[in-house]
């Protein structure tokens, strides 16, 4: 650790450390909370021993920089040594929830819930179908799928701890908030609970959806001979397409159609469109997710399309694919025999296509922050599509 104290005094005060406002620079990285203490005298009792401290340019503030996004603003004086200790139990609980929230990759959780809700309503044929029986079937599918989703994203983090220290240092395994053993316990528990629920529900479409997702998610991430398919760009994209485009649409639709409603298998026009459209979207997500991660992927030998073809080319390929998908959706919506379906489908997809183009033109491809923000915007378009799908008839 390198430390530099110039023209400053450091004294112990009330169980903490007191720095007078002078130039202070301590160089050391660890798990840190972010604090901003604006005072000529600052008493700080950091949660962790080593902190990265830099003045904010005005000489009167102490900045501690974190490895994840949570920020706290604290004013403390020598007469308030308990400033960092109050409500410690509540704070510990909130921190635990925050760590699990980041571990679960919430954008995938939202996508899973919306996709299952949307395709489930594709099986609704009449108003009387909307009943407690339908919502019970949806709840069974959502809970089982969410637990499997946590297994898949958790296993990916366990396999990518070193890469995530470069690409996603805010994730709890990469930051050290979770130990490897904790991560293993979480993914093992959620996979077992997912299969248990799928089995007791007694729906074969649901159980096979969970099983195939488990197999593909494991093969995608785990570092074993002939596996860790994420190393190969085309195979990785096919895994994501299989789960997000095919399994989600068909298996969960059949869960409602055959298990909940007890009807024969029937592939409707909206289901076929949803599967085709989400195939495009899943390819885009598979390609786009690696654009901001190019630095770590290069270091650890992950041959993503962004590494081999370049960020700019992959970025505009993704935008073009989505615009093509929206054009097809507009044409399909325009052929609907129902006026209300035609209006909602056409207007909705025109708005989404226009919004995507405007956002893409504004992205600075040299900024990892902007690319990551645009990737999360792609997920919002993904959510919006699932809101539109039930209106396609």
UniProtKB/Swiss-Prot annotation:
UniProt-listed NCBIfam families: PRK12887.1
Catalytically driven reaction(s): phytyl diphosphate + homogentisate + H(+) = 2-methyl-6-phytyl-1,4-benzene-1,4-diol + CO2 + diphosphate
Transit sequence range: 1-36
Broad EC category: transferase
InterPro entries in alphabetical order: AtHST-like, UbiA_prenyltransferase, UbiA_sf
Taxonomy, superkingdom: Eukaryota
Any one GO cellular component localisation term in the record: chloroplast membrane
Gene null: resulting phenotype: Reduced seed longevity, severe seedling growth defects during germination and high levels of lipid hydroperoxides and hydroxy fatty acids.
Similarity section: Belongs to the UbiA prenyltransferase family.
Pathway where it operates: Cofactor biosynthesis; tocopherol biosynthesis
The encoding gene: HPT1
EC identifiers of the protein: 2.5.1.115
Transmembrane recorded as keyword: yes
Purpose: Involved in the synthesis of tocopherol (vitamin E). Catalyzes the condensation of homogentisate and phytyl diphosphate to form dimethylphytylhydrquinone. Low activity with geranylgeranyl diphosphate as substrate, but no activity with farnesyl diphosphate or solanesyl diphosphate. Tocopherol functions to limit lipid oxidation during seed desiccation, quiescence and germination and early seedling development. Protects thylakoid membrane lipids from photooxidation and is required for low-temperature adaptation.
Ranges that cross the membrane: 108-128, 133-153, 170-190, 205-227, 232-252, 271-291, 314-334, 338-358, 371-391
One Gene Ontology term of the molecular function aspect: homogentisate phytyltransferase activity
Name the UniProt record assigns to this protein: Homogentisate phytyltransferase 1, chloroplastic
GO biological process, one term: phloem sucrose loading
Additional note from the record: Seeds and plants overexpressing HPT1 accumulate increased levels of tocopherol.
Compartment(s) where it occurs, according to its Swiss-Prot or TrEMBL record: Plastid, Chloroplast membrane
Entry membrane topology: Multi-pass membrane protein
Keywords for this protein: Chloroplast, Membrane, Plastid, Transferase, Transit peptide, Transmembrane, Transmembrane helix
Entry annotated with the keyword Transferase: yes
